[in-house]
């Protein structure tokens, strides 16, 4: 079995899609827009696990405080600086082991996103 997607329902749909496309670097692999329904699937490529973003204007700004999504990056320090320049408020860098460093940042919908360099 392979994981298909992680779904985020949000009132800030355009900002959310932009975050995962422009900051994380995912590509739109499928988009569905019919009437009031608007869904975008983003991933690293066809057949890969997707972030499914659903436009839900009544979703408010709250999200599951325990949800966290992690991405690997080649240079966590550089990405953290870029996010700060764009107005995001990333956590301090953490390094629980010599070959691992990471930080967290909230996406526009309030989901905690971790960017990890190194690791397993």
How would you describe each model-predicted region?
Residues 29, 80-120:
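Vicinal oxygen chelate
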Residues 19, 77-82:
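Short amphipathic alpha-helices within nucleic acid-binding modules
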Residues 1-17, 67-71, 119:
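N-terminal beta-strand motif that seeds the catalytic metal site of vicinal oxygen chelate
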Residues 38-40, 67, 99-103:
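Short beta-strand micro-motifs in enzyme catalytic cores
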Residues 47-51, 61, 110-113:
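Short, charged/polar, Gly/Pro-enriched secondary-structure boundary elements
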Residues 7-48:
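Core segments of cupin and vicinal oxygen chelate
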Residues 1-2, 61-66, 96-97:
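Short glycine-enriched loop/turn motifs at secondary-structure junctions
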């Amino acid at each position: 079995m392979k994981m298909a997607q992680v779904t985020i329902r949000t009132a800030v749909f355009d900002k959310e899609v932009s975050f995962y496309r422009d900051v994380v670097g995912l590509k739109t692999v499928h988009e569905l827009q019919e009437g009031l329904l608007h869904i975008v699937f983003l991933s690293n490529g066809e057949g890969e696990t997707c972030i499914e973003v659903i436009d839900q204007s009544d979703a408010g700004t709250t999200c599951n405080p325990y949800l966290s999504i992690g991405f690997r990056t080649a240079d966590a320090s550089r990405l953290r600086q870029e996010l700060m320049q764009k107005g995001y408020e990333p956590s301090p860098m953490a390094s629980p082991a010599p070959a691992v460093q990471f930080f967290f940042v909230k996406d526009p919908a309030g989901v905690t996103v971790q960017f990890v360099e190194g690791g397993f």
